[in-house]
Curated annotation (Swiss-Prot):
This is Serine--tRNA ligase. ATP binds at residues 270-272, 357-360. The keyword NADP does not apply. It comes from Cupriavidus necator (strain ATCC 17699 / DSM 428 / KCTC 22496 / NCIMB 10442 / H16 / Stanier 337) (Ralstonia eutropha). The lineage of its organism: Bacteria, Pseudomonadati, Pseudomonadota, Betaproteobacteria, Burkholderiales. L-serine binds at residues 239-241, 293, 392. InterPro entries: aa-tRNA-synt_IIb (IPR002314), aa-tRNA-synth_II (IPR006195), aa-tRNA-synth_II/BPL/LPL (IPR045864), Ser-tRNA-ligase_type_1 (IPR002317), Ser-tRNA-synth_1_N (IPR015866), SerRS_1_N_sf (IPR042103), SerRS_core (IPR033729), tRNA-bd_arm (IPR010978). GO terms for molecular function: ATP binding; serine-tRNA ligase activity. Catalyzes the attachment of serine to tRNA(Ser). Is also able to aminoacylate tRNA(Sec) with serine, to form the misacylated tRNA L-seryl-tRNA(Sec), which will be further converted into selenocysteinyl-tRNA(Sec). It catalyses: tRNA(Ser) + L-serine + ATP = L-seryl-tRNA(Ser) + AMP + diphosphate + H(+); tRNA(Sec) + L-serine + ATP = L-seryl-tRNA(Sec) + AMP + diphosphate + H(+).
Amino acid sequence: MLDIQLFRKDIDAVAQRLATRGYQLDVAAFQALEAERKQLQTQTEELQARRNSLSKQIGMLKGKGEDASAVMAEVGGIGDTLKASAARLDEIQAHLAELMLAIPNLPHESVPVGNDETQNVEVRRVGEPRQFDFAVRDHVDVGDKLGLDFDTAVKVTGSRFSMLRGGLARMNRALVQLMLDTHTQEHGYTEMYVPYMVNAASMRGTGQLPKFEEDLFKVPRKVGSEDGERIENFYLIPTAEVPLTNIVRDAIVAGEKLPLRFVAHTPCFRSEAGSYGKDTRGMIRQHQFDKVELVQVVPAAQSFEALEQLTGHAEAILKKLELPFRTIVLCTGDMGFGSTKTYDLEVWIPAQNTYREISSCSNMGDFQARRMQARMRAGQGKPELVHTLNGSGLAVGRTLVAILENYQNADGSVTVPAALQPYMGGITRLEPEM
């Protein structure tokens, strides 16, 4: 959530920055609410001052034994007016808060201006795509003989789910272990095990609610109380960013404890609303997928340096696996709702002859921290908002896809990347099932 003072100081400048990311701010509606808020606040303050003055008069009149009934009647009338004004002011404040929750973050000045993904800017490219001397197969065809099973997953659950068997399941586990070991032992992250369901307050804190509710899987439950039963919703996490970032919700962290670096491996659950017809074949876009997530909580002055570091931490996994990739900076029109700057890592997918996203690394600035009231205190100073960052380190399923395609052999086998072999008991090749 943005600081409402930015809107009060120069709403036109804010509107212009938001327009670069395709968001049209209703300036007139905001200004109308602000004008009424100011008028009500002024009226309330004047009425309170008048009531206080009259209350003193009542005391003086009674002290002299004089009739104070007329003044008391006026105080009663002021009380009724104040009550109505306070109720209307609460309505306006709630409406403003609702508006603020729906407004995306402001893009950082270093972010290229653009309308969509075609205007993202490549920052660097690492590794050269392999030149095959046989017809390249996609990961579905390669995996079919190695234990990648969509049919059974459809029978058990439905579309956009998959099952892994044997060596392929072991490789999936090995990838998770490699990622966690790298981030904890080399990059200084603390491994966390987190709930896979969170409450609505956590989803609001990181920005999934209220805007993206249709993308979430909701788990309603009945909660009993003295007033009877009510329905309370849990949500399956779309990313471990949600529980990890909410660790600091409603907290004041001592400045000397920052930065905080958390890493977690979790399944992620997404309804993929609005994705009908996209990536229907294979593991690229699923309702459930594994991901190793990186989250950092840092002082404001360090967040953009931290973004470069976090992006490098995600890149390190691709380098260890020797997978060709490129890093791009997203333009204003392609950034996520809460981000002020984002780098995407895209891995080479031979069967598609293109790079596909495998990690998104974002600096959220104080956008999430303001929603969560996540603050730090340096020494004896006043509490101030922290900055939060997150990134995939990496999406496990898409990493598996990249290995199946980039390391495939003409005989249907897949070479195990050298970095994974210690996690797979020295196995160097996955052979097709007979």
